[in-house]
Curated annotation (Swiss-Prot):
GO terms for cellular component: cytosol. This is Translation initiation factor IF-2. It comes from the Bacteria. Coiled coil: none annotated. Residues 279-332 have a biased composition (Gly residues). Residues 470-641 form the tr-type G domain. It comes from Rhodococcus opacus (strain B4). The keyword Cytoplasm applies. Residues 504-508 are annotated as: G2.
Length: 974
């Protein structure tokens, strides 16, 4: 075949389909694209050797030569037609070692492969005990040549194994001509196959074999039993196996174009069923022209795979063990060339996968399978996820498919989408199923990591001790509602703030700075006023965190109240010193000593009782002992606190409260904790950012810079920051915007995870039923009030039949956008200390949106609670109307059975519910009185002592039965 062979041409030549041939090529490590692709000559040769149909003409034994055919050119024994088969000629006396040493098996690494055929055939097969072990070379020590001579009579006595005798001293016969179509060196006619070439002839289409690769590998078990060591005949010294032909003696190597075409396997002569004479020595009945050491007729050599025979009866070694260079291959064939067009060595087996395929399949295996979904398997690694993370975030951390996590959660009873925020418990449950430890990062840690990504820190003073300067103390006034906190601040500031508060209660945090004297020195003190109402728990906690010292105001006539205890807990949790101000000592019934005793239970022991807490009896209304209270505050601050900060660094602080001003936009009351805030600084507070355009103090005066412990109102935010958010100065607006955006996204995810109602598969039926839901939109004058109102509304205890959902919240007046959202979602708008803007009222009237305005927080809570209870399904209770006894029975073809009754108690009404009793046993539970007559006249009701006739929706009635009528009335909820 000229040039490279194509796959489909090889398939046609080998008698197989192209698909099978492509599969074989893939098993051998040769990857071709299609049947039209070409393959290299060594690959094509391996393919021809791999298919039995192609090897039947190459390696199978042939029958004897046909009558009339020309004899081979070599002086071999030929079979005469019609005559008896000649017996073996007795070997002539072989005088020298060359004749006896030629048939001896030589090691694969030393003996030349093309042994002399005449000398090989002259030596008959050795006895079974002397046969060499396959794959094992004989000892290298040369043995005397005598054992080879007496072996001739033994072989001659076997008529079934004729052999050609060697003539001593005569010329060696030349190599036999190769078969047509297999050897390109052949010049014989193509119409008749020629015998197999002798070992000395070069292999067609392949380089000259190296020493030790002369013959094909015999099949296992066909070479006879193995001889004991040392019985396989003498091992010749190097160079005694006959001269090696010179490179020019084999004829010129033809080009691929001059090679004759390979005959079709179907046109080759069939194998003979019986052994032909002239077979290989070592097994009777070999094919003519067989190689020394071969098996019987039609079989391969008797050596083990990958090893050569070692004694008479075994062929030359053909390569090493499998898997080694020069070894492997199919049994009886030469070893594969190491690294040539595929894997070196190694026998290609059909149906086996390569190591690469096995490795790829192993790497793609994933476990465990949760609910039929394959998930990655962890080794107890810790996965850090933000609060409110989605399954997509989780999948990105563990390199998994989000859809698989969704399916796994569905099988675990949770229905979520890939981008939906998931609560902490669900994430931990899913992580445990995959052997991961899910660690939900706290908001503080997440914010710290966010600032670290921008090389920012919060909460630490820069520089050393020499950079720190003293600052005023920050004092928070805490206590129960109506105990006089704001009046105390008014007395200290000599102002009147309380009258401006709705309902006389504080609903904001106010920050003020007061100048006072201590030992003749003027000292500044910053005061923060916190609400005392129960709804403002978060604001009190925020005030405790932003302060240095707390004044606990307790009314002497009221005692310790729930919000007093809560304020103590907030201050102790923030590790803040407490000074107790016992207020209202001027009122009747005031008992300051009782207050001291009650507070002892909470760890506040007065100094006069041996403790370390300072108690001051004051009257905020009369202004009694106010100076003593300020002195106690300053003394406690100087003794217990290190009030120093670095004023030269970028400002850091906390937003105490924030609101939306109609003319100025978002305004935040900020307490500077360290550094100095200046006009023009780029700032970020929570999810709000901006640039400081203006700063105003508590008196309304403009301030250019704010030092530590200075409360100011900051104008310039793009949105209203949350109360309690940390304020930070950054280098440029771009960084502030990026920090705010990421905080906003985190806040949204956490809020979505918190508000998502968990619905399991068991509750799916009931969840899909119509449920009552009250949607609210909250608008307030500042963010702290809106936050407190939302927390209070969510704290209303109500049945699961009704859900409360806050769909939007904000600071400022009610806008048209709020009205449109309320109209689309059937929501109610609650405005706290705000009113509708522009045409929002007209739009609300046109759309039918209800807007409620409140100025006191508990009024809003009470009305929302009533609305929620009104949305509940009514509760009915059963009320007995009366009883009637059946005295007679009448039958009618139109209405059925008619009962003549006497009303024994109460009243019997038409269409009322009833139950039928027989011998004080309920026969029918839900029966309706369908008709009622009195003296042949229809009646609506019949009272006690009167007779009546009635029909029931139950026909099995008897005389003596009792009819008990009742009705269901709605029961008011508590």
């Amino acid at each position: 075949m000229a040039g490279k062979a194509r796959v489909h041409e090889l398939a046609k030549e080998l008698g197989v389909t192209s698909k099978e041939l492509l599969a074989t090529l893939k098993e051998q490590g040769e990857f071709v694209k299609s049947a039209s692709s070409t393959v290299e000559a060594p690959v094509a040769r391996r393919l021809r050797e791999s298919f039995p149909s192609a090897k039947s003409a190459d390696s199978a034994a042939r029958p004897a030569a046909k009558p009339g055919a020309p004899a081979p050119s070599t002086p071999a024994t030929s079979a005469k037609p019609g005559g008896p088969r000649p017996g073996p000629k007795p070997a002539a006396p072989a005088p020298a070692a060359p004749a006896a040493a030629a048939p001896a098996a030589t090691p694969a690494a030393q003996a030349p492969a093309p042994a002399a055929p005449a000398a090989s055939t002259a030596t008959p097969a050795a006895p079974a005990s002397n046969a060499p072990k396959p794959g094992r070379p004989t000892p290298a020590a040369p043995a005397p040549a005598a054992p080879a001579a007496p072996a001739a009579p033994a072989a001659a006595s076997t008529p079934a194994a004729p052999s050609t005798g060697a003539k001593p001293g005569g010329p060696r016969p030349g190599p036999k001509p190769p078969r047509v179509g297999n050897n390109p060196y052949s010049s014989a006619p193509a119409e008749r196959p020629a015998p197999r070439p002798a070992p000395g002839a070069p292999r067609p289409g392949a380089p000259r074999p190296a020493p030790g690769q002369g013959g094909p590998r015999p099949a296992p078990g066909q070479g006879g039993p193995r001889p004991a060591p040392g019985q396989g005949g003498p091992r010749p010294a190097p160079g005694q196996g006959g001269p090696r032909p010179a490179p020019g003696q084999g004829g010129p190597r033809p080009s691929p174009g001059s090679m004759p075409p390979r005959p079709n396997p179907g046109a080759m002569p069939a194998r003979s069923a019986r052994p032909a004479p002239g077979g290989r020595p070592g097994r009777p009945g070999g094919a003519p022209g067989g190689r020394p050491g071969g098996g019987g007729g039609g079989y391969r050599g008797g050596g083990a795979p990958g090893a050569g025979a070692g004694a008479p009866g075994g062929g030359a070694p053909a390569g090493g063990f499998r898997g080694r260079p020069g070894g492997g291959g199919r049994p009886g064939q030469r070893g594969a060339a190491a690294g040539a067009f595929g894997r070196p060595g190694g026998a290609p087996r059909r149906g086996r996968k390569s190591k690469r395929q096995k490795r790829q399949e192993y790497d793609s295996m994933q476990a465990p399978a949760v609910g039929g979904v394959r998930l990655p398997r962890g080794n107890g690694e810790t996965i850090r996820l933000a609060r409110g993370a989605s399954l997509s975030d989780f999948a990105e951390k563990i390199d998994a498919n989000p859809a698989a996590l969704v399916q796994a959660l569905f099988n675990l009873g949770e229905m979520v989408t890939a981008t939906q925020s998931v609560n902490d418990e669900t994430l931990e449950l899913l992580g445990g199923e995959m052997n991961y430890v899910v660690q939900v990062v706290s908001p503080e840690d997440e914010d710290r990591e966010l600032l670290d990504s921008f090389d920012l820190t919060y909460g630490e003073d820069e520089g050393g001790e020499e950079d720190l300067e003293s600052r005023p103390p920050v004092v928070t006034v805490m206590g129960h509602v109506d105990h006089g906190k704001t009046r105390l601040l008014d007395t200290i500031r000599k102002a009147n703030v309380r009258e401006g508060e709705a309902g006389g209660i504080t609903q904001h945090i106010g920050a003020y700075q007061v100048l006072t004297e201590l030992d003749g020195n003027e000292r500044l003190v910053t005061f923060i006023d916190t609400p005392g109402h129960e709804a403002f728990t978060a604001m009190r906690a925020r005030g405790a965190k932003a302060t240095d010292l707390a004044i606990l105001v307790v009314a002497a006539d009221d005692g310790v109240m729930p919000q007093t205890v809560e304020a103590i807990n907030h201050a102790q949790a923030a590790d803040v010193p407490i000074v107790v101000a016992v207020n209202k000592i001027d009122k009747e019934g005031a008992n300051p000593d009782k207050i001291r005793q009650q507070l002892t239970e909470y760890g506040l022991v007065a100094e006069e009782y041996g403790g370390d807490t300072m108690f001051v009896d004051i009257s905020a209304k009369q202004g009694t002992n106010i100076d003593a209270l300020l002195e106690a505050v300053l003394l406690t601050a100087d003794a217990a606190l290190d009030l120093r900060a670095n004023p030269d660094m970028d400002a850091q602080g906390v937003a105490i409260e924030a609101h939306l001003d109609r003319g100025r936009g978002p305004v935040a009351t900020v307490l500077i904790q360290r550094g100095t805030l200046r006009v023009g600084d780029s700032i970020v507070a929570g999810d709000a950012y901006g640039r400081v355009r203006r700063m105003v103090d508590e008196h309304g005066d403009d301030v250019l810079e704010a030092m530590p412990s200075r409360p100011v109102q900051v104008v310039g935010f793009t949105s209203v920051p949350g109360a309690g958010d940390n304020l930070l100065v950054v280098d440029e607006d771009r960084i502030a915007r990026q920090i705010a955006d990421r905080r906003n996204a985190r806040k949204r995810n956490a809020l979505a995870a918190k508000s998502r109602k968990r619905i399991s598969l068991e509750d799916l039926d009931s969840a899909l039923k119509e449920t009552s839901q009250l949607n609210l939109i909250l608008k307030g004058d500042n963010s702290g009030t809106v936050e407190a109102l939302e927390e209070a509304l969510h704290g209303i205890e109500i049945d699961d039949e009704v859900q409360l959902r806050v769909i939007d919240r904000g600071v400022g007046g009610v806008t048209e956008t709020n009205v449109n959202l309320a109209a689309a979602s059937n929501a109610i708008i609650i405005g706290f200390n705000v009113r509708a803007e522009g045409k929002a009222t007209e739009l609300a009237n046109r759309e039918g949106v209800d807007i409620r305005y409140y100025s006191v927080i508990y009024q809003a809570i009470d009305e929302v609670e009533k609305a929620l209870k009104g949305m509940l399904k009514p509760i009915y209770e059963e009320v007995e109307l009366g009883k009637a006894e059946i005295r007679a029975m009448f039958r009618s073809s139109k209405v059925g059975n008619i009962a003549g009754c006497l009303v024994t108690s109460g009243t019997i009404r038409r269409n009322a519910k009833a139950r039928l009793l027989r011998d004080n046993t309920v026969v029918a539970e839900t029966v309706t009185i369908s008709s009622l007559k009195r003296e042949k006249e229809d009646a609506v009701e019949v009272r006690e002592g009167y007779e009546c006739g009635l029909t029931l929706t139950y026909s099995d009635i008897k005389v003596g039965d009792v009819i008990e009528a009742y009705e269901l009335r709605e029961k008011p909820r508590d």
